[in-house]
Amino acid sequence: MAFQEKLIDSLGSFATKFNSYRYIMAIKASFITLMPVIIVGAFSVLISNMVLDPKNGLASFQALSFLAALKPITSAINYATLNFLNIGAVFLIGIELGRINGIKTLFPGLLAVICFICVTPTTVEMLVEGEMHVVKDVLLRQFSDTRSLFLGMFIAILSVEIYTWLEHRDGLKIKMPDTVPPNVSASFSALIPAIITTTAIATFGFVFHQVTGMYLYDAVYQVVQQPLERVVQSLPGILLLMFVAQLFWVIGIHGNQMIKPIREPLLLGAITVNMSAFEQGKEVPNIITMPFWDVYMSIGGSGLTIGLLIAVMIATKRKEMKEIAKLSFGPGIFNINEPVIFGMPIMLNPILAVPFIITPLVTGSIGYFATVMGFAGKAVVMVPWTTPPLINAWLSTAGSMGAVVTQLLCILVSILIYLPFVKIASRRVEQAQLQAASVETAKNA
């Protein structure tokens, strides 16, 4: 018992410190804001390929062939949303970190974007008809989409931290008379810190390239982002991430929030790559994405508690457990399961904690191998996490019935895993009540 309490205290202390770390706060808030943009782009991909595509969509039917002429609309939406996610992330992280640092304007976000572009190569060598041509003043797609996400986060944080430090130095502020409007005065006040920050970041990028022969993008992508992508795209890697999240849930800490700074950039980046490939008719590369997590590892909410709710209705006669299951079923359909986690409870419950941790690891493995074997389609559409089961499987895979069947299998497996533990938990409650009743009877005798 002492070890359990010590573990809970240690994890709780770590979670509190982790969530209060300002860089983590800024990154989490930024990706929450970005989510609608990703979903808009996702549904444009879905409509483009399932409705407007002249080969595979509804437009392939003669009567609906006119729909193909509308495809440029969805292509434009796709380009504007998915191809500039990194720019949006840099801008939002700059704003959020600036706000945390006490700067209430939007300028830190704009400065972060400027600094990011300062370290990004804008000259490209292209082979055209056997001859090498140099093209200047272009921003390649790999620098604006999720492939440069980690570089973007690093530059946004670095530039805003430098700017904040300089902005707090009174000697660097250009002070205007009191008659000057506050917004104009603030602009002049930020001028010298902004010049120094931009120059410092641009110089850093230039010196790094001169010394190493590599751009910052190449270094960060090869050393940090690519290895992390390989880990998370592996089955052991994603299962480990899920295990950590579930462990935090069990001690009463929001597990998904704890892993969000790692999970969101990598899994949202993976689904963005898939959506772009799907839109262009190329092979979809990634199995493990944000929809994969939702469709196979979080059905009904963390721990696949939809299986627990059904198992309770099947395996126990305990009225209070059934009432909690009934009340939790409505939110559970939309993958909201705090009522069952804290009401059953699963939190700090050693019996129900075991299947709560194990079940998503099993179903994640099922989903992974079903996709590897080609039975279930890969996710190519980002759908809201509150989308009900079966619907989210069908939508996220652009109509793969194999994915729907696999998700049904995962639900069935989750019920089978939870059933024996529900029976044990029910018996424990009954034994505790009988023991309490016997003690009460002995007192009254």
What is the meaning of each model-derived region?
Residues 8-30, 70-73, 177-188, 339-341:
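Cytosolic juxtamembrane amphipathic/interface segments immediately preceding
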Residues 20-173, 347:
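Early transmembrane hairpin of solute transport permeases
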Residues 47, 51-56, 97-105, 166-175, ...:
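Membrane-interfacial segments
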Residues 1-21, 63, 168-177, 212-217, ...:
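Short, membrane-interfacial amphipathic segments enriched in basic
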Residues 87-93, 97, 114, 280-351, ...:
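Alpha-helical membrane segments and immediately flanking helix-loop junctions
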Residues 22, 30, 36, 46-75, ...:
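Helix-loop-helix hairpins and the membrane-proximal interhelical loops
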Residues 2-18, 53, 57-71, 275-284, ...:
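Transmembrane alpha-helical segments and their short flanking loops
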Residues 40, 86, 90, 94, ...:
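Alpha-helical transmembrane segments in multi-pass membrane proteins
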